[in-house]
């Protein structure tokens, strides 16, 4: 349980920092691959994914004997990818406006939810080895798309910066 709390804190802090890294780095494109380059929903998903992927270097050592590690990790990543836009657009639809505090809370709710699911899935009965292989492939696909969609964003509302109405690196103000 202590490791869960530490993971939530570390991922939250690193995600918060990565929101500003692109600006701090004078718009370094390599830094931009792993940090937020604009204010789109996708870039906010990215700042939750980056520290989670980095944290995998640590939790992989801690959970290396868990049969469910890769399954739990892919579910954790998918929760971030799905829950963030669901909560953001859900509250935006219900209340017809953005609220900066709610936006920030959503980020932390998503981190807490995904890390808690990761922790709990490592406690249940082992999943079939085939599920773990599929999970590894899915993690690699997520990471590949993560990089690709930063370089070549889809012309869709998830990738559109609401401030500049542009996409990807071009969406930076």
Annotate each PLM feature.
Residues 7, 72-80, 103, 107, ...:
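Alpha-helical transmembrane segments of multi-pass membrane proteins, especially transporters
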Residues 1-7:
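N-terminal membrane topogenic signal
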Residues 55-56, 72-89:
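Small-polar-interrupted transmembrane alpha-helices in polytopic inner-membrane proteins
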Residues 20-39:
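Membrane-interface helix-loop junction between the first two transmembrane segments
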């Amino acid at each position: 349980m202590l490791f869960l709390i530490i993971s939530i804190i570390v991922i939250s802090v690193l995600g918060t920092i990565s929101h500003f890294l692109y600006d701090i780095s004078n718009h370094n494109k390599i830094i931009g691959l792993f940090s937020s380059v604009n204010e789109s929903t996708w870039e906010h998903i990215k700042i939750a994914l980056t520290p989670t992927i980095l944290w995998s270097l640590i939790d992989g050592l801690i959970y290396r004997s868990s049969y469910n590690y890769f399954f739990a990790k892919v579910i954790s990543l998918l929760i971030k990818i799905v829950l963030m836009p669901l909560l953001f657009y859900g509250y935006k639809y219900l209340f017809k406006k953005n609220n900066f505090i709610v936006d920030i809370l959503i980020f932390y709710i998503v981190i807490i939810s995904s890390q808690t699911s990761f922790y709990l899935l490592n406690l249940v009965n082992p999943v079939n080895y085939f599920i773990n292989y599929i999970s590894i492939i899915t993690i690699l696909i997520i990471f590949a798309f993560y990089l690709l969609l930063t370089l070549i964003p889809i012309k869709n509302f998830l990738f559109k910066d609401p401030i500049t109405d542009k996409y990807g690196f071009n969406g930076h103000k």
